């Protein structure tokens, strides 16, 4: 399969730069997997689409203020984007500079350059940085970091983004991008879903900056997926198995929840799914046999991205590309701060190719 098979025309005007004033009032395009039928509505229509006993699986990662500005002690300006916190003192990061820093380079970070750090090692495209500060890394980031808005949101981050670019149930700091399907859930909608008898469970996948990296090969089978840390604890496994046993659906909120659940299923030795704690490089594209999820809530993704490939593997290539064409025609808002889709599984998708 070629990467260009997953291309589509997207007017710049449809890229959302700010979220809707009310989280759950975004538009919702529903795609019926088996038939390809499309229905237009709003996000709160989920209340009618979900049944008592269905299981929603959320990603409770919390976005960290991962973008830092400063300079090398020798003078050159730098921009640091944290990829992963290694411990209380060290990070792995992307560094943008006119000249890449060498091990031992001192970095002065923050508006007043009061935070001192040292680049200690290089690991491929990533730099290991150690802070020379008594505070833990997370406190430093909260003090001087900027929210790492995606590259297609062409504006500086604002104070409001610290909450808007966070799910209301975010709990575990570590992501450098939000699990954006979850941004549409507010407390009243969550309460209404609970009241209806919809079950909820939480995985953790710390979304890395690699999620925004373009696919740089022509043939998708040649693509090497970036690595991200995921946790699928025992209580999630129990909830999934219980939902399946009673004939209910497992509904992933976002592609990160999909990748967490399917990673846990791939690694399982005997059961459908078992607890999983570790890095995952799972790459889902047409031909993949889904093991766990029955429905998916997700935003609209970039052309030629691994995420539109994941959706195509679930709903079928033709149904997915037709839905995206319709979304553009109907002026849905795209990407992180945009509108959402509710998709049910297409059992024929596994045998369909572009």
From Swiss-Prot:
Gene Ontology cellular component terms for the protein in this record: cytoplasm
Top enzyme category: transferase
Keywords in alphabetical order, please.
Cytoplasm, Queuosine biosynthesis, S-adenosyl-L-methionine, Transferase
One example of the protein's molecular function in GO is: S-adenosylmethionine:tRNA ribosyltransferase-isomerase activity
The protein's matches in Pfam families, at most eight in alphabetical order, are given as: Queuosine_synth
Kindly give the InterPro entries that the UniProt entry links to this protein.
Answer: QueA, QueA_dom1, QueA_dom2, QueA_sf
SUPFAM superfamilies in the record, alphabetically? QueA-like
Keyword Cytoplasm carried by entry = yes
Q: Which reaction does it catalyse?
A: 7-aminomethyl-7-carbaguanosine(34) in tRNA + S-adenosyl-L-methionine = epoxyqueuosine(34) in tRNA + adenine + L-methionine + 2 H(+)
- Annotated pathway: tRNA modification; tRNA-queuosine biosynthesis
Q: What Gene3D superfamilies does the record point to?
A: QueA-like
Q: Which cellular compartments is it found in? A: Cytoplasm
Q: What is its main location?
A: cytoplasm
Q: GO biological process: any one?
A: tRNA wobble guanine modification
Q: Which domain of life is it from?
A: Bacteria
Protein EC = 2.4.99.17
Similarity comment: Belongs to the QueA family.
- Task performed by this protein: Transfers and isomerizes the ribose moiety from AdoMet to the 7-aminomethyl group of 7-deazaguanine (preQ1-tRNA) to give epoxyqueuosine (oQ-tRNA).
The UniProt subunit note reads as follows: Monomer.
Entry's NCBIfam families? PRK00147.1, queA
**Protein name, UniProt field:** S-adenosylmethionine:tRNA ribosyltransferase-isomerase
Instruction: Say which species the protein is native to.
Output: Salmonella typhi
Q: What is the lineage of its organism?
A: Bacteria, Pseudomonadati, Pseudomonadota, Gammaproteobacteria, Enterobacterales
Q: Which gene encodes it?
A: queA
């Amino acid at each position: 399969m070629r990467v260009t098979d997953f291309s589509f025309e997207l007017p710049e005007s449809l890229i959302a730069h700010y979220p809707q004033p009310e989280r759950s009032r975004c538009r919702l395009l529903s795609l019926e997997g088996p038939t390809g039928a499309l229905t237009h509505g709003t996000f709160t229509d989920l209340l009618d689409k979900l049944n008592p006993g269905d299981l929603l699986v959320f990603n409770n990662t919390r976005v960290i203020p991962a973008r830092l500005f400063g300079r090398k002690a020798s003078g050159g300006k730098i921009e640091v984007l944290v990829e992963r916190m290694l411990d209380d003192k060290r990070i792995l990061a992307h560094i943008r500079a006119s000249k890449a820093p060498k091990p031992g380079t001192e970095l002065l970070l923050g508006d007043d350059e009061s935070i001192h750090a040292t680049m200690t090692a290089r690991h491929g495209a990533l730099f290991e940085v150690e802070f020379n500060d008594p505070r833990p890394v997370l406190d430093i980031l909260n003090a001087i970091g900027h929210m790492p808005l995606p590259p297609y949101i062409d504006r500086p981050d604002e104070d409001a983004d610290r909450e808007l670019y966070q799910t209301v149930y975010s709990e575990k700091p570590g992501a450098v991008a939000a699990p954006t399907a979850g941004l549409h859930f507010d407390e009243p909608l969550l309460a209404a879903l609970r009241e209806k008898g919809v079950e909820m469970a939480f995985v953790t996948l710390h979304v890395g900056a690699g999620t925004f990296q373009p696919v740089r090969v022509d043939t998708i089978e040649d693509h090497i997926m970036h690595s991200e840390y995921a946790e699928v604890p025992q209580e999630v496994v129990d909830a999934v198995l219980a939902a399946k046993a009673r004939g209910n659906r497992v509904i992933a909120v976002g592609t990160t929840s999909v990748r967490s659940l399917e990673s846990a299923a791939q690694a399982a030795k005997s059961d459908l799914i078992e607890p999983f704690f570790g890095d995952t490089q799972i790459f889902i594209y047409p031909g993949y046999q889904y093991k766990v999820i029955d429905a998916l809530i997700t935003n609209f993704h970039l052309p030629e991205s691994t995420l539109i490939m994941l959706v195509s593997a679930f709903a079928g290539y033709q149904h997915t590309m037709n839905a995206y064409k319709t979304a553009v025609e109907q002026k849905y808002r795209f990407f992180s701060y945009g509108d959402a889709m509710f998709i049910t599984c297409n059992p024929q998708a596994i045998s369909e190719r572009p």
